């Protein structure tokens, strides 16, 4: 307050010092989720450690990438499965995506590969079996929990230890974000996830949107059946997903309104899309040499993400065929079997510096599975996309980018070699794609605070204030008929009907009186004339 009006640099320093001093160190519990989810959550955790907070990460001892070289206390618990089990189940899951795509809750529920989810759900049971660990957590008196809600465990931990929580997610499956945050999502223009609809839906799509919402209400709890059983067991009371999610203090959502469509939000939702974008670093020699050799045509970067390792052979050959028909050099991150028809402009690599390559001016296009990390790297660097979504939020991400003219979406199951070739030629040669993604890029980057700083601020806010109850809407305390004001509407309707009824009765009475008089007069008149 005292700083306003001062313009010399010295008071500015004082102000900065004051704001720094405000961030007193606290104690934070982190419950992460494995896989690509951890990539960005990790950057927030690292920054919180750097800022001097005492951070404890609780993770299963079997994992792909959790924990690695974090400079903080890491507590592991033993799991009921091995790394081989995890790999095998994930492979089965990824493999199934090449056969049929999940476009409804029903197909999600009926998926024959859902064992992977049950492995993740079982983590929490394992955590709470470790009595020493639970005792340690209880005695540590944390200020808050920072969690990825995917496997529910962080939500259960927050509730069990009665700690305020910060949820970190791209989105929440089913209707649990709307329910947990009490956020309205009108079905007329807010598409449900998995459908791949835009916000301008046809009548048929709006009908499908409603049915999807109904499916969520009817079927989602069955998808989370095992997770909820474990939660009820740990919390020793029957719990629903709503019970778990509605405990959340702050929602850190990895999206923004450059990627997503505008829609209603709540005051405890913070949008940190693009948190994974980094300043491009110089390229390793190997990749610089590929770019130098590509000449005036430049390069195309191709990656289906860290989670897809193998593509069915026929599909891989169709893709390789299309890649050979463009003049650009294609750098393809692929660890599966080398397609026999691979053209000489296509280079297979086991790994590539994706963000740095996308940041290079010679990069013409990005072929991606449209995972949110890749899409944001594309937005940040302004590279048009050819998108081949496979599962999760990817169909939706792709649709959003396509409707904004920043890329072309292909149905990976049905596309032919020509489709891919045409899509590539379109995004490379049609200037509008580049212009649109550059526009999105400048909109996305025009912001007062970097997403990483925003995320760190809100975690610290919850730690400082032991939650954010002032942001919690009173909607949580209402019954469903109160929320929709059905009782008020019913009451008012009753009043109006009663008034209408009484008025009608009075009029009818009055009318009858008048008529009666007239009638008698008439009658009297008649009898006189007789
Ligand atoms: C880890 O943190 C400690 C103190 O918090 C610091 O002294 C040390 O340099 C850090 N190590 C790394 C590898 O960052
Ligand atoms: C690529 O070209 C640039 C500019 O011509 C040059 O400075 C660089 O050394 C080249 N890199 C490689 C690996 O050939
Ligand atoms: C790639 O193959 C085509 C014919 O298939 C040939 O014309 C071209 O010279 C080859 N390029 C390189 C760099 O070997």
Curated annotation (Swiss-Prot):
Complexes and interactors: Homodimer. Homooligomer. Interacts with UGT1A1, UGT1A3, UGT1A4, UGT1A6, UGT1A7, UGT1A8 and UGT1A10 to form heterodimers. Isoform 1 interacts with isoform 2/i2 suggesting that oligomerization is involved in negative regulation of transferase activity by isoform 2. Isoform 1 also interacts with respective i2 isoforms of UGT1A1, UGT1A3, UGT1A4, UGT1A6, UGT1A7, UGT1A8 and UGT1A10.
UniProt-annotated location(s): Endoplasmic reticulum membrane
Top-level division of the source organism's lineage: Eukaryota
Family matches, as Pfam families: UDPGT
Signal peptide start-end: 1-25
UniProt keyword terms in alphabetical order: Endoplasmic reticulum, Glycoprotein, Glycosyltransferase, Lipid metabolism, Membrane, Signal, Transferase, Transmembrane, Transmembrane helix
GO molecular function: enzyme binding; enzyme inhibitor activity; glucuronosyltransferase activity; identical protein binding; protein heterodimerization activity; protein homodimerization activity; retinoic acid binding
InterPro entries: UDP-glycosyltransferase, UDP_glucos_trans, UDP_glycos_trans_CS
Similarity-based family: Belongs to the UDP-glycosyltransferase family.
Membrane keyword on record: yes
Any one Gene Ontology cellular component term annotated for this protein: endoplasmic reticulum membrane
Sites where a glycan is attached: 71, 292, 344
CDD domains with a match to the protein in the record: GT1_Gtf-like
EC nos: 2.4.1.17
Transmembrane segments: 488-504
Protein name in the entry: UDP-glucuronosyltransferase 1A9
Topological relation to the membrane, as annotated: Single-pass membrane protein
Catalytic activity: glucuronate acceptor + UDP-alpha-D-glucuronate = acceptor beta-D-glucuronoside + UDP + H(+); 2-hydroxy-17beta-estradiol + UDP-alpha-D-glucuronate = 2-hydroxy-17beta-estradiol 3-O-(beta-D-glucuronate) + UDP + H(+); 4-hydroxy-17beta-estradiol + UDP-alpha-D-glucuronate = 17beta-estradiol 4-O-(beta-D-glucuronate) + UDP + H(+); 2-hydroxyestrone + UDP-alpha-D-glucuronate = 2-hydroxyestrone 3-O-(beta-D-glucuronate) + UDP + H(+)
């Amino acid at each position: 307050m005292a700083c306003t009006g001062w313009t010399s640099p010295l008071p500015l320093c004082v102000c900065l010092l004051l704001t720094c001093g405000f961030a007193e160190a606290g104690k934070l519990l982190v419950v992460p989720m494995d896989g690509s989810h951890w990539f960005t959550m990790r950057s927030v955790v690292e920054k919180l450690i750097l800022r001097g907070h005492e951070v404890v990460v609780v993770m299963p001892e079997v994992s792909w990438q959790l924990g690695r070289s974090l400079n903080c206390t890491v507590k592991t618990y033993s799991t009921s499965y091995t790394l081989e089990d995890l790999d095998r189940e994930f492979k089965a899951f990824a493999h199934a995506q090449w056969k049929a795509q999940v476009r409804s809750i029903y197909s999600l529920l009926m998926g024959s590969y859902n064992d992977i989810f049950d492995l993740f759900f079982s983590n929490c049971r394992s955590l709470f079996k470790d009595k020493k660990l639970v005792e340690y957590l209880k005695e540590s008196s944390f200020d808050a929990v920072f969690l990825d809600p995917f496997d529910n465990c962080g939500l259960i931990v927050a509730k069990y230890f009665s700690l305020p929580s910060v949820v970190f997610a791209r989105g929440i499956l089913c209707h649990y974000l709307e329910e947990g945050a009490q956020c309205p999502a009108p079905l007329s223009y807010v598409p449900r996830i998995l459908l791949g609809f835009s916000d301008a839906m046809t009548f048929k799509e709006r009908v499908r949107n409603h049915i999807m919402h109904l499916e969520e209400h009817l079927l989602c709890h069955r998808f989370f059946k095992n997770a909820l059983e474990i939660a009820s067991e740990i919390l020793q009371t029957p719990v629903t997903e709503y019970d778990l999610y509605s405990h959340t203090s702050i929602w850190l959502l990895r999206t923004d309104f450059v990627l997503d469509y505008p829609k209603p939000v709540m005051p405890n939702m913070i949008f940190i899309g693009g948190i994974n974008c980094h300043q491009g670093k110089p390229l390793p020699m190997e990749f610089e040499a590929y770019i130098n050799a590509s000449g005036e045509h430049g390069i195309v970067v191709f990656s289906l993400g860290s989670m897809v390792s193998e593509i069915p052979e026929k599909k891989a050959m169709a893709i390789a065929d299309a890649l050979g028909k463009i003049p650009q050099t294609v750098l393809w991150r692929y660890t599966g079997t080398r397609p026999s028809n691979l053209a000489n402009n296509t280079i297979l690599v086991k790994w590539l510096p994706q963000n740095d390559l996308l940041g290079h001016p010679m990069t013409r296009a990005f072929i991606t599975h449209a995972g949110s990390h890749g899409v944001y790297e594309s937005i940040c660097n302004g590279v048009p996309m050819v998108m081949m979504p496979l599962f999760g939020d990817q169909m939706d991400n792709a649709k959003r980018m396509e409707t904004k003219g920043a890329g072309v979406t292909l149905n990976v199951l049905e596309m032919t070699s020509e489709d891919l070739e045409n899509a590539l030629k379109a995004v490379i040669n049609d200037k509008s794609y580049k212009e649109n993604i550059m526009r999105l890029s400048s909109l996305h980057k025009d912001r007062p605070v970097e997403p990483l700083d925003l995320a760190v601020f809100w975690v610290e806010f919850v730690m400082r204030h032991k939650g954010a109850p002032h942001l919690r809407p009173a909607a949580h305390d209402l019954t469903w008929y109160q929320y929709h004001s059905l009782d008020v509407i019913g009451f008012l309707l009753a009043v109006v009907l009663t008034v209408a009824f009484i008025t009608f009765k009075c009029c009818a009475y009055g009318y009858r009186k008048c008529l009666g008089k007239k009638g008698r007069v008439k009658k009297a008149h008649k009898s006189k004339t007789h």
